[in-house]
Regions:
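Structured core elements
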Residues: 50, 91-93, 171
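Extended, charged alpha/beta regions that create polyanion-binding interfaces
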Residues: 55-167
């Protein structure tokens, strides 16, 4: 990937590296520079701009993040949702309550592939309610080598799984004493089960 200042007449098709303040807002970093953006930049008196330009073996940050995120949930037919990609980031949320399985060895292997590719997850067996986030894939640069994308996807394949509860009701057996009627323990267990959409009978 090439990175640095270029004259405006050479900037078309490149990626804007830094946000540029405008009288009525700003031109956001990461946007693809076209004729309209060049005209806007000229209009505020700029003659050059700092850009990133992907090489033939580079993958755009959004496409790279999506490819890696899809590999993470490979084999998981339901339960893990990939949210829309943006600025090189894909958040992975759970579609239903459950506990998240995380293969730490695969996560560590993925994070060792390229410093421009990162994965963060909740702890293994974290209990999550429907809609909560389980992991984030982030490509830090505007683009990353296709070889790194392929290696990261392979390293992290199937690293995330969701395990929803198999039962929808549960019974609690408690030992109580005259000093403790078990109410606080009952409420604590009930709250944890409710987070998994399991009713305590």
């Amino acid at each position: 990937m090439q990175f640095g200042p270029v004259p405006l007449d050479q900037a078309e098709g490149a990626i804007l590296a830094h946000s540029v303040p405008l009288p009525n807002g700003r031109l956001r970093k990461g946007c693809r520079i076209g004729p309209e953006e060049i005209a806007t930049l000229r209009g505020i008196g700029l003659s050059d701009v700092i850009v990133a330009r992907l090489g033939p073996q580079d993958v755009h940050e959004d496409a790279a993040a999506r490819t890696i995120a899809e590999a993470l949930v490979a084999g998981q037919t339901a339960g893990l949702d990939l949210r829309p990609v943006g600025t090189g980031r894909v958040n992975i949320h759970v579609a239903e309550a459950g506990v998240v399985g995380v293969d730490a060895a695969r996560v560590n292997a993925l994070n060792a592939v390229d410093p421009m590719v990162t994965l963060a997850t909740v702890p293994r067996w974290q209990r999550l309610a429907a809609g909560e986030m389980a992991a984030t894939v982030k490509v830090i640069a505007y683009g990353v080598a296709s070889a790194s994308v392929a290696a990261a996807a392979l390293a992290g394949q199937g690293a995330l799984t969701l395990h929803p509860p198999r039962l929808r009701t549960a019974a609690l057996i408690q030992t109580v004493t005259p000093e403790d009627d078990g109410g606080s323990g009952h409420r604590a267990i009930e709250s944890r089960l409710q987070a998994l959409q399991v009713a305590l009978q």
